[in-house]
Regions:
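Insoluble glucan recognition modules
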Residues: 2-10, 18-243
Length: 243
């Protein structure tokens, strides 16, 4: 069967994880006067200091209650180092949070945050979603091993077909790719954790964050760049074959 090469995969997760400090590279800028907010710092990260790309922001929730006070970040973490969370208040005061007691282990480890606590670590290099629950002062560290799912893929809508993730330092991206996988001329999405959402402990219950990436608008995948968003529409493949 003739191989068909398309730019489907690359969920290219243009997550702007930012590894370059070249002048003019907006993916990575060291901040000298750190604005109010929450940041991830440490040698497990790809940031040498607080940076625009290391600030936590509101995630794509799946029907979470209005006012849910969780922020987070997709970021590459290294098993050889450690990280802490930096909070900067409106007066410029900085507070470093480390790990306290374990709150939950599934679907991902959740810890109570402690001022000056032990730094966090991960068992293997990879892309993670780090969620800071500001209401309960907790941190959830979620591995995001993306795959593809859908009737265009080998496992249909039953489960993900694994992709290989790698940090591209030169391009300041995390790239997920597949090779020699037969895909049909149908629909697919990107997903991790074998579920459509991940439950994050919150206020004695949980809130769900999308663990699937779809299209910003329904349409076919082409060889051009296609933007993804949490919980977005299905992508449509226009060519069947080995990808």
């Amino acid at each position: 069967m003739k191989k068909v090469f398309e730019y489907i995969a690359t969920l290219l997760l243009l997550l702007a994880v930012g590894t370059s400090c070249e002048e003019g590279n907006d993916n990575w800028k060291v901040i000298t006067a750190v604005p109010t907010g929450l940041y991830i710092t440490g040698d497990a990260t790809i940031y040498s200091a607080a940076a625009t790309s290391s600030q936590l922001t509101t995630p794509a929730f799946d029907n979470a209650p209005e006012g849910t006070n969780i922020v987070g970040i997709y970021t590459w973490l290294k098993s050889s180092g450690s990280f802490t969370m930096l909070e900067v208040d409106s007066e410029g005061n900085e507070i470093n949070y480390g790990s306290g007691e374990s709150v939950a282990t599934t679907p991902a480890p959740t810890y109570r945050l402690t001022v000056g606590g032990s730094p966090f670590t991960v068992a293997k290099d990879g892309l993670y979603y780090v969620a800071f629950n500001k209401a309960d002062n907790q941190l959830t560290v979620i591995p995001t091993d993306f795959g593809i799912i859908g009737d265009a893929t080998p496992q249909q809508w039953n489960d993900e077909t694994a992709m290989a993730g790698a940090l591209n330092e030169a391009q300041a991206t995390v790239e997920y790719t597949i090779k020699d996988v037969t895909l049909d001329k149908k629909e697919m999405k990107f997903r991790y954790l074998h579920n459509w959402g991940v439950d994050i402990p919150y206020q004695g219950a949980t809130v769900k964050m999308h663990s699937n990436m779809g299209a910003v608008a329904k349409g076919a995948i082409s060889e051009a760049f296609s933007e993804c968003k949490g919980g977005g529409d299905n992508f449509t493949l226009v060519k069947a074959g080995i990808h």
